[in-house]
Amino acid sequence: MSFLFSGELRSPKNASTERFVSVRGSDAYKELCSLGMLPSSKDLRQDSIFRAVANEVKQVKQDVVEINSRVVAEVQVEKELAEHLNQKLKASEYKVDHLAKKLVRLRQKHSTNTQRQVRKLDDCIGDFESNIRELHGTVAEMVDRLGSVDMGLPEKERLIGDHQLNARHYPLLYELFRDKFPSKFGAPRGLGIASSLPERAFPKALGESDTGDLSHHDVATREAPPLEMDSAEEGCFYHPQNLAVDHIRNHFMNSRSSDINERELEISGSAHATKASSARENIPERILMPQFQKVASPQTAPTLENIEVTVPFSSKSAGHERHSG
């Protein structure tokens, strides 16, 4: 054992004397002595080991329990949130499905109703067309009959012609008979009948008073001036198939005539209040004129003695109300 000796080995020849070094004096022994004492066998048992690390084991158990509780709580929260979202999704799915079914039912219902209404509308349009054709046939038959009846009358008593039937008083009949019997009518004319009437039958201008014969002004200014129209406008308004435009034109002519008469009455009433309250009012020729009624000429216009004026066209009552006010 080399660690029991110090010094170098010498050959036997050279080693005459040996020096003994003790174990306690060696460095290895010193290192061995510096080590701790070995525990006893009792201390190396399992229960002894767990008793030695009991605090550490307890802390580890507590940490594991805390981690487990936190993980379980988080999992429970996530589970509740997932269930809540699932319930909302189911409710939304039910609503969407309900709305979709309702929309499909409404679409089918409205589609059925629309198809039924379209069929009814087609039937109504067909009925209208058949009625229009029947009306055209009836009108043509009536015109033929009237023409045959008129041909049976003496020459002087016949009504179909420019001398009896004119475009101003009978626009629709004039157009019908002129198209059916063009030989009995002259060339198409505009409504220029007013040009043949005396100038005194129409007022000079709205708001302009006459300083001459006041009685002549009272009679003349109460006549409604007719609307002058050329042949193009006349054809537009008085075409037999254009009844709506004819109604608008009649309404416009009536409103214009009533406005002119009211302004004329205000002018004449301011100059002669006493005379205007007792004077008889002449009826404008366009106010009470029906569509197929012949109206007398302005020289023989009817008065309040032989005709009854309705309330919407009673200019006399309006004049009395203004004077009494």
Curated annotation (Swiss-Prot):
Gene name, Swiss-Prot/TrEMBL: VAB2
Family, similarity comment: Belongs to the VAB2 family.
Record keywords: Coiled coil, Cytoplasm, Cytoplasmic vesicle, Transport, Vacuole
Annotated function: Component of the biogenesis of lysosome-related organelles complex-1 (BLOC-1) involved in endosomal cargo sorting.
Any single Gene Ontology cellular-component annotation: vacuole
Compartment(s): Cytoplasmic vesicle; Vacuole; Cytoplasm
Lineage: Eukaryota, Fungi, Dikarya, Ascomycota, Saccharomycotina
Keyword Ribosomal protein attached: no
Assembly behavior: Component of the biogenesis of lysosome-related organelles complex-1 (BLOC-1) composed of at least BLI1, BLS1, CNL1, KXD1, SNN1 and VAB2.
Designated name of the protein: Biogenesis of lysosome-related organelles complex 1 subunit VAB2
Organism name: Eremothecium gossypii (strain ATCC 10895 / CBS 109.51 / FGSC 9923 / NRRL Y-1056)
The keyword Transcription appears for this protein: no
Ranges in a coiled coil: 70-135
